[in-house]
Amino acid sequence: MSDDPIVLAKAALRLEAAVRRDAAHAAGGETAAGAVARHGIGVLGERSFRTISGYWPMRSELDIRPLLGLLADTGRDVALPVVLGLGQPLEFRRWRPGQALEFGRFGTAHPPPEAKRLEPDVLLVPLLAFDAAHHRLGYGAGFYDRTLAALRRHKPVLAIGVAYAAQRVEAVPRDAWDQALDLVLTEEGIL
């Protein structure tokens, strides 16, 4: 284990944040999913973009499948991320409601290899904790940080964290390579 204070602070916060998220999910996950769909389509429905990436929820992540369905109904391309390997950015494959998914690394679900690869303009990003400055704490493998950095090098993208309001913390410990979010979407609205 590292003795780097940021690494230690992140590890401690991950444990606390997972408990906090589990409790929020148990207390109202289904209700929160509906609220996030309403808030999300309200904000995203009027924006100009072609492709949005979401995620298939695992563990106690906030369920954005209702929002993904609404976005697909608007005619936009919806993609889900694929973990190709450690140290690599995510790949995004087109998803359509009702499509069969495969299970990949770390328990993620994604479209099969023959699905069209897409580059998102907007990313809906899962997380364990966030703060008022839109800093995000993930699971620690750096997939979204690498992906956002790679995308932002050649085009503007909108990164929206998705979380229960209870996942907000005073401050997320950060390293220089951590990518901030542009917005955070919770069951209470957009921050």
Residue spans for each PLM region:
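N-terminal active-site beta-alpha-beta segment that forms phosphate/nucleotide-binding
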Residues: 2-119
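Conserved phosphate- and dinucleotide-binding cores of soluble alpha/beta proteins
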Residues: 2, 88-191
